[in-house]
C-alpha cells in the first residue's frame, strides 16, 4: 500500500474555490483502479495549543493506493489534468508526500 499526504496551500481567500473543484473531481478519482481512500481535510477546531494549525488557506488530501502503479496512473489521469488546469491560478503551493507503511 502507498499513502499520500498532499498539503495544498491556496492563494489567500481561495481555499473554498479550490475545495469546490476538488470535490467535483473526487468521484472520478475514487472510481480509479487501486484507489482505497481519497479525501480532503482541514484544521480541526477545539484542540488549543495541542495542535499545530496549518492555517485558513491550507487543506490536506489524504490518499491510500493499492500500489505504486495505481498512484502513477492517478497522477496522469485526464481528470487530474483538468483539475490542475481549473485550479492552477488559485493554488499558491503544494507539497506531495508519498509514504510507505513500516
PLM region descriptions:
Residues 14-40, 79-83:
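Short amphipathic alpha-helical segments
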Residues 2-9, 39-75:
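Short, well-ordered beta-strand segments in beta-rich or mixed alpha/beta enzyme
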Residues 39-57, 82-102:
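Glycine-rich beta-strand-turn "strand-cap" elements at beta-sheet edges
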Residues 12-13, 65-66, 102:
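Short loop segments at secondary-structure junctions
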Residues 30, 66, 92:
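Short conserved AdoMet
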Residues 1-2, 102:
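Absolute protein N-terminus
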